[in-house]
């Protein structure tokens, strides 16, 4: 695999996570927000970034298990919804000081 091929695969997997978390690819976000610098993750909340980090690990496991990309996207979206619900509820409890 060439470096260019590896970069394309990495970008595609990053967009799987972006769609699961934010409902859009990085390109779609940039087109919707041309006035903003950076990328979608630069504007994510702490909880969204925590969720994304968890989803990256889960996605790696799903890839190792041979789960097709479409199925991974559905599962990761469900995981994102559940994790964000938990993280947002934890914020309200002030568990970390």
Model-derived regions: residue spans:
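Positively charged, phosphate-engaging catalytic surfaces used for nucleic-acid and nucleotide handling
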Residues: 1-97
